[in-house]
Amino acid sequence: MPKVRTKDIMEQFHLELVSGEEGINRPITISDLSRPGIEMAGYFTYYPKERVQLLGKTELSFFEQLPERERKQRMMSLCTDITPAIILSRDREVPKELIEASNENGVPVLRSSLKTTRLSSRLTNFLESKLAPTTAIHGVLVDVYGVGVLLIGKSGVGKSETALELVKRGHRLVADDCVEIRQEDQDTLVGSAPELIEHLLEIRGLGIINVMTLFGAGAVRSYKRITIVMNLELWEQGKQYDRLGLEEEKMRIIDTDVPKLTIPVRPGRNLAVIIEVAAMNFRLKRMGHNAAEQFTSKLADVIEDNGQDE
């Protein structure tokens, strides 16, 4: 699980540290935020203390109406030993009870000028991205006509050479050899290259080349959503390959099923063109145009008409 600490969100969103400085290295383990409205009323039975706490105008205006004794109790209960941070929006004034409780328990109190809903949305998106489940796959990720194509297959089958040809044809390289994948949403997989090999491509007999240096900034991308997987495998005599395009394979990556095509490799086949056409055909299918289904439907009509004539 990737690690995010309180100081990371401080730096990302330029938050002002008000108190509790000793806790800025506390880990944030969940992307959900908490707006402790019911807790301000004194109900802490289901208080999600492991979440970042966000205080807006509603929570603070209610807090100001509480008796002084209760105010101190509420803030002491709010600042636990595992609470990553308490953030105030709209540059609201920090209650002195909160400053005292945060210093005593080492809970960072931060302040932002953003509106509560805006801050909540940006924080959630940032944390979901950073805390998303991740994995790494041996393959090549290329952006082909806006479609994120993940090329997989045994070592030496020609993935990198195919990627180089695609780059020459105007498409963009995301990652070669090792693709780091994170699941940002239920059906959203985003791939990127490890920092060490970003923009690099290994070609056997040629060595390592820097795609951005050779072809320019327009030939690379830092990350791309994975839309389809293409498995390159050496052509096996006698093996049946899909010739109509009606059968749809799936490959499970983390918790997401991604459409998968198996493309046999043999001398004379232009893989780059095949992958381009596969990407365009995939886009057409998503727009409701399926050539294989249309052909099958027409064929069935012809067979039915011939049967009636007889």
From Swiss-Prot:
Residues 201-210 are annotated as: Important for the catalytic mechanism of both phosphorylation and dephosphorylation. GO terms for biological process: regulation of carbohydrate metabolic process. It catalyses: [HPr protein]-L-serine + ATP = [HPr protein]-O-phospho-L-serine + ADP + H(+); [HPr protein]-O-phospho-L-serine + phosphate + H(+) = [HPr protein]-L-serine + diphosphate. It comes from Bacillus pumilus (strain SAFR-032). Both phosphorylation and phosphorolysis are carried out by the same active site and suggest a common mechanism for both reactions. The active site is at H138, K159, D177 (proton acceptor), R243. HAMAP family: HPr_kinase. PANTHER family: HPR KINASE_PHOSPHORYLASE, PROTEIN YJDM-RELATED. Transmembrane segments: none annotated. Keywords: ATP-binding, Carbohydrate metabolism, Kinase, Magnesium, Metal-binding, Multifunctional enzyme, Nucleotide-binding, Serine/threonine-protein kinase, Transferase. Belongs to the HPrK/P family. Residues 264-269 are annotated as: Important for the catalytic mechanism of dephosphorylation. The keyword ATP-binding applies. Homohexamer. The gene is hprK. ATP binds at G153, K154, S155, G156, V157, G158, K159, S160. Mg(2+) binds at S160, E202. Catalyzes the ATP- as well as the pyrophosphate-dependent phosphorylation of a specific serine residue in HPr, a phosphocarrier protein of the phosphoenolpyruvate-dependent sugar phosphotransferase system (PTS). HprK/P also catalyzes the pyrophosphate-producing, inorganic phosphate-dependent dephosphorylation (phosphorolysis) of seryl-phosphorylated HPr (P-Ser-HPr). The Walker A ATP-binding motif also binds Pi and PPi. It holds the Pfam family Hpr_kinase_C. This is HPr kinase/phosphorylase. Its cofactor is Mg(2+). GO terms for molecular function: ATP binding; magnesium ion binding; phosphorelay sensor kinase activity; protein serine/threonine kinase activity; protein serine/threonine/tyrosine kinase activity.
